[in-house]
Amino acid sequence: MANGKDVRIRVILECTSCVRKSVNKKSIGISRYITQKNRHNRPSRLELRKFCPYCYKHTIHGEIKK
């Protein structure tokens, strides 16, 4: 019954502004969230506005590869 390709998969979201700042070494760290997405409804990369504790504001967090 269970397929190898599940419909809901676990994804990691990473703050896009912290990634840009870490190149210049201005950021303390990089904010990451773990969530799930439905592969059939959202085949493209997931982007959500979440709170970043390093930037102290709401920023766009994008999906990264594992």
UniProtKB/Swiss-Prot annotation:
Disulfide bonds, which pairs? none
Q: Which InterPro entries match?
A: Ribosomal_bL33 (IPR001705), Ribosomal_bL33_CS (IPR018264), Ribosomal_bL33_sf (IPR038584), Ribosomal_zn-bd (IPR011332)
What is the similarity comment for this entry?
Answer: Belongs to the bacterial ribosomal protein bL33 family.
The identity of this protein, by name, is Large ribosomal subunit protein bL33c
Spell out the Pfam families in the cross-references: Ribosomal_L33
Species of origin: Populus trichocarpa
Q: Which UniProt keywords apply?
A: Chloroplast, Plastid, Ribonucleoprotein, Ribosomal protein
Gene name, Swiss-Prot/TrEMBL:
rpl33
Which PROSITE patterns does the annotation name? RIBOSOMAL_L33
Q: Which GO terms describe its molecular function?
A: structural constituent of ribosome
Q: What top-level branch of life does the organism fall under?
A: Eukaryota
Any GO CC annotation of this UniProt entry: ribosome
Please name the GO terms of the biological process aspect recorded for this protein, alphabetically: translation
